[in-house]
Amino acid sequence: MIIIPAIDLKNGCCVRLEQGLMEKDTVFNDDPGAQAVEWQRQGGEILHIVDLDGAFAGEPKNRSAIEAIVKSVTIPTQLGGGIRDIATIEAYLSLGIGRVIIGTAAQRNPAFVKEACAKFPGKIVVGIDAKNGMVAVQGWAEVTGITATELARQFEGDGVSAIIYTDISRDGMMQGPNIQATKALAEAIKIPVIASGGLSSLQDIENLIAIESSGVTGVITGKAIYSGAINLAEAIALTKKQR
């Protein structure tokens, strides 16, 4: 189990949203590069970056902040938000981003995921965000009629590195991840699943470690480490004990 610290970017700053609502944002740091260095210093093994403005606009919006993060750290990075075409993937990978996350475009155009995986093997992650089990897209502004499991199954065999599963109702609410839904998704597919949304305590991490054998390989944390509810270094030490 790998703990993955998140940096969510809005207007060039590190922010956290509640349940994906852009108007419910809290700025935690106006220097994303410095924040990235801090998470690396505490033992972060991968950084999760989200271009929130990009997710809503459907095109990259925080390039200079993303560049600052990549230049500041030596650990791998993964980035999502507004990635809708091959050219954008290419641009981010050449910038030094390790893996890109396809979200809305994966639901709207599954063939795009297949094409991206063929062109950039090992570099493509699919982000599936769900509200009451149904996939939400366009920065979570629109809920579709397809379930998370139905969507995830479409990518079996495409070469997707991982699926990031976010339960929107838990995101930023500090109520613990949706263990049941995450486990059910991981058991339904062969692709490794990374949990996201709601992590609030070391107990939550223990609960996720308990379902690791189902195929849950990591967890993304944002608000909990920014607010101090979880100490990142302690959380990482806990997972390393189990490895």
UniProtKB/Swiss-Prot annotation:
Its UniProt pathway annotation is: Amino-acid biosynthesis; L-histidine biosynthesis; L-histidine from 5-phospho-alpha-D-ribose 1-diphosphate: step 4/9
Gene3D superfamilies annotated for this entry?
Aldolase class I
Catalytic activities: 1-(5-phospho-beta-D-ribosyl)-5-[(5-phospho-beta-D-ribosylamino)methylideneamino]imidazole-4-carboxamide = 5-[(5-phospho-1-deoxy-D-ribulos-1-ylimino)methylamino]-1-(5-phospho-beta-D-ribosyl)imidazole-4-carboxamide
Cellular compartments annotated = Cytoplasm
Top-level enzyme category? isomerase
Q: Which positions are catalytic residues?
A: D8 (proton acceptor), D129 (proton donor)
Look up the record and give one Gene Ontology term from the biological process aspect. L-tryptophan biosynthetic process
Q: What is this protein called?
A: 1-(5-phosphoribosyl)-5-[(5-phosphoribosylamino)methylideneamino] imidazole-4-carboxamide isomerase
UniProt entry keywords in alphabetical sequence: Amino-acid biosynthesis, Cytoplasm, Histidine biosynthesis, Isomerase
Which GO-annotated molecular functions does the record name? 1-(5-phosphoribosyl)-5-[(5-phosphoribosylamino)methylideneamino]imidazole-4-carboxamide isomerase activity
Instruction: Give the UniProt family note.
Output: Belongs to the HisA/HisF family.
Q: What are its E.C. numbers?
A: 5.3.1.16
**Which Gene Ontology terms of cellular component type are present?**
cytoplasm
